[in-house]
Amino acid sequence: MTEHTLEVLQFSRIREIIASYCVTDEGKEFCLKKNPDTDIKKIEEEKKLGIDFLSLLRAYKAPPIKYRPPVLPFLEGIEVEGAALDIEGVYSVGLLALSVFSLHEWLSPFLENEDLNENSIVSFVKKIPDMLHLKNLVFSFIDENGELQDLPSLRAIKNKIRSIEDDIDKTMRNYFTNDATRQMLQSNLPTVKDGRQVIAVRSNFKGRIPGIIHEYSQSGQTFYLEPEEIVLKNNDLIAAHAEYERELLRLLQDLTSQIAEHTENIKEACEAITKLDCVAAASRWAHSNNCVFAGSIDLGLSHSIDKDGSHDSKGTPLAFYLHQARHPLLGKSAVPIDLKLSKDDRVLIITGPNTGGKTVSLKTAALFALINQTGWPVPAGPLTRLPYFDFIACDIGDEQSMDQSLSTFSAHMKNVSEIIRRAGDKSLIILDELGSGTDPQEGCAIAMAVLDDLLEKKAFVFVTTHHGALKNYGYSKESCVNASVEFNQNTLSPTYRILMGVPGESHAVDIAKRNGLPEHIIEKAHTYLGNNRADVSDLIKGLIQKHEDLNEFELQKKEEELKLKEDRRRSDLKELQLKQKELELKKDGIKRLDLFFEEKRKFLENLVRELREGELSREKTLSVKKWIDDFEKDLDKEHEALKLEQTKIDERLHSSKEKNKAPQNPELREGTRVIIKSLNRNGELIREEKKGKWLVAVDNLKLTIAEDDIEVCENQEKLKLSKPIVSIISDTSAPSSRPSFELRLLGMRAEEAQKALQDQMDLALVHGITEFAIIHGKGHGILQELSHDFLKRSPYVKAFRFAKPEEGGSGKTIVSLG
């Protein structure tokens, strides 16, 4: 990455923003020096740290990083014999040791949980050297405010100093209280000169008090006298202070020599906490600004390293995808854009009006690549996927060089020449207004030749232009894609949205009109443009309208599909509940029959015993016959009661199935008017292609449609729209009819996880389970976000939370239903 590219894209401002989230001065300095990397392993490790820190941050379990003054400057020369740190230096070392101690305290609960041990931040903190001994050593010398402890060897000297000071104060008070001397003094308080206590005496009393004169006032009216009886005491005080300083120096030297033994650990810990502070800053920025860590795409394999989101809606593998990307320096005014290139595409040509957002889109793409390769998150949607480039270069804006006397065009060509020289198949090249600044025909020819060369090198190229020929170039090359910035024809202003696959217009005349150019000039301009240009303009407008219609149709189709799925799910759930009711009824019936037979068995045993023990009489014979008749009647009653309950269940099941069953098509034949259910469009059968497939004319299109997606129109004379019909599709591949108390999503794709969550919710409701767990892991957070979004939308969820560290931590979510 060249300094020119970093400067043009204002990467230094990104560093400043993230550095502002740092806690330590060393962390800020580290952030401000960070540059994009090309070592994929290092970038992935950095991103993994950020992802895991963000996960802990969202779970309110982030490691503590405390402010502390820089330590490294104090370590210079520390290992020299006799070296002594001052109190400030000792305090800085102590605060570092205290920071490490706090991190290791935070680490303790994580070490007891194997799942949390996989978190890269936990592993990172584990590697920071233990500094408990150093912490205890330093804080036995000073307290946590940086003040000296009450050390025994210093305490004796301080007591001696205090005793001498008390003696001096007592002697001095005599001068201020004695009537004979008090009138000689200029002040009733002693003062200090050169570290010795003196009294201020009026000059006219000179010689009246024996002692040493230290100084005269400027006016000469006062002199400062050290009384004779104080001289020796002052000497003793100065000597005591010197003794104190010598002892303090000895203690500091001894402490410093012990600290020096930990120099390597101090440096290692300092480096680790500095890096952790930078990682934490990027994660806090991500948390505050809805940023994500972009998924990774390996250009060598042309697929996503993490698999998720590596294909577009049509299943085409992607090589570059910005999803709802917002330029980080535009704040809330940034309009989210989507940019994508499939694995076979290499050049994106963006056209459209000035001030429409073309250049901002280019800068966003390039800046995101730089941020991503620094290991930092980007302000975008969760589907964002970026490859790793070994060279990122741009030619943007007015590159005119005044000091080299180069024109705008010359400056551009000089820059482009250097870019072409260095470009390769893992390069990202940004070219703004390629071929401008000179004759349009020649500029356009140069632009196409440059793109030919970059295409041959298989470089990724994002280019903006006003040249109409470059739009045609985009359609004539297989690896090129046209795009445009949207323009609102009603307001005559840009919307700043990117339309993929559609070329744009400059709209110069429309913009001129909006900015007040007189109407007669506007009309004249249209005349000069000519009809051919107007026809092309209308064609492009038509394409844009078709593009919008298609997007609207796709959105409508998705909404209908979601409604179908929800209706189908509700119906399946209802049927499942009925089946559960049927099962409960059968269990209840079996229980009732068991009780019934047990009661009759006991009665029969008693009857047999009576017959054995007594003589057979007519009364006993009649009694047995009566019992048998009663038994048969009771048995018939039980059977009828169960049969009636079963009939009710069967009727409800049948009603549910009939309500949701799609009517069978009558005999299909050529010319029959039909409704395509999945498209909600009318059509006419042309012919049967093969068994179960028909060729259908829909508007101006001919489509091959599956027979089960076709419904015959009731009125064959007039086509009409029909609402889609919900049908129940039984899932024979369902793994279980019972919910799991611990649903594992690890290794699933997004669609599989979504279905597993829905099945779990349905089964939990049917079986009356009020709490279960979801194991989604940490990773890039995709499965975690998907699970939490699902739970937020579900009306059956009472609450959900991350598991406690001892339960599994942030890789697991506990769900309560209510």
Swiss-Prot record:
Entry keywords, A to Z: ATP-binding, DNA-binding, Endonuclease, Hydrolase, Nuclease, Nucleotide-binding, RNA-binding, rRNA-binding
Signal peptide: none
Ligand binding (ATP): G352, P353, N354, T355, G356, G357, K358, T359
Chain ranges of the Smr domain: 743-818
E.C. number(s) listed in UniProt: 3.1.-.-, 3.6.4.-
Biological processes per GO annotation: mismatch repair; negative regulation of DNA recombination; rescue of stalled ribosome
TM helices/strands, residue ranges: none
Gene Ontology molecular function terms on file: ATP binding; ATP hydrolysis activity; ATP-dependent DNA damage sensor activity; endonuclease activity; mismatched DNA binding; ribosomal large subunit binding; rRNA binding
NCBIfam families (UniProt xref): mutS2
Similarity field: Belongs to the DNA mismatch repair MutS family. MutS2 subfamily.
Assembly notes: Homodimer. Binds to stalled ribosomes, contacting rRNA.
Official protein name in the record: Endonuclease MutS2
